[in-house]
Amino acid sequence: MRQHVNPLSHFFQLHNELPRPEDLFESIDLPIHLDIGCARGKFLIDMAADNAQWNFLGVEIREPLVFAAEKERIELGLTNLRFFFCNANISLEKWFLSLENGQLKRVSIQFPDPWFKKRHRKRRVLNQSFLFLLAQSLDIGSELFIQSDVISVMDEMTEIIELSHFFDRHSKYSESNLNANPFKFCTEREKYAIHQGVKVYRQLYFRNSTGIL
């Protein structure tokens, strides 16, 4: 079951400043994978343990999950991984400005809170403004991966991304939806959905050469 928090409430509108990359990771010359809405962080913990040539950052709006994820990261001694509590739509813009060109190589948004009621849809994490920030921060060829078990959420994310013209579907995964996760590991939510026989919708994009005016 998803545990929702309202990202538009006053508390979650406060800016939580994320450290600059050089203050986050031991090896700052490695590419960064940013996972937005990382939940308990099991996906990134597995990815970081298996990919020493990448740095990983997970951000999550539910603070207890961040505490648990960061505690496990420390226990495992993973220096190429960090977790932070923040509202991505509020706190990431300034952090993006601290990045060197080409430093952010992959962004994933996996199973975001669906906010089914029409009046609540403005709470969804991916909107046109936030996508514009991602397009500004990702170099040509960098990846954007999305997935959800709610078709209406997936359709909305796909529409926002493709109407922006900043991203193209990855040629290797150009079908309407990916049948399999392109990564070696899954999130907790994906494992649960698969176990329950729920269909998962996915798409992998890369940043194209369309400039930002």
UniProtKB/Swiss-Prot annotation:
Annotated binding of substrate, by residue: K117, D149
A Pfam family assignment: Methyltransf_4
Active site per database record: D113
Enzyme class: transferase
UniProt cross-references to InterPro entries, sorted A to Z: SAM-dependent_MTases_sf, tRNA_(Gua-N-7)_MeTrfase_Trmb, tRNA_methyltr_TrmB_bact
EC number(s) given by UniProt: 2.1.1.33
Pathways per UniProt: tRNA modification; N(7)-methylguanine-tRNA biosynthesis
Binding site for S-adenosyl-L-methionine: D35, E60, N87, D113
MF annotations from Gene Ontology: tRNA (guanine(46)-N7)-methyltransferase activity
Any one Gene Ontology cellular component term annotated for this protein: tRNA methyltransferase complex
Superkingdom, taxonomy of origin: Bacteria
SUPFAM superfamilies according to UniProt: S-adenosyl-L-methionine-dependent methyltransferases
Record's catalysed reaction(s): guanosine(46) in tRNA + S-adenosyl-L-methionine = N(7)-methylguanosine(46) in tRNA + S-adenosyl-L-homocysteine
Keyword Cell membrane: no
Keywords from the UniProt entry: Methyltransferase, S-adenosyl-L-methionine, Transferase, tRNA processing
Family: Belongs to the class I-like SAM-binding methyltransferase superfamily. TrmB family.
Function: Catalyzes the formation of N(7)-methylguanine at position 46 (m7G46) in tRNA.
Protein name: tRNA (guanine-N(7)-)-methyltransferase
Gene symbol of the encoding locus: trmB
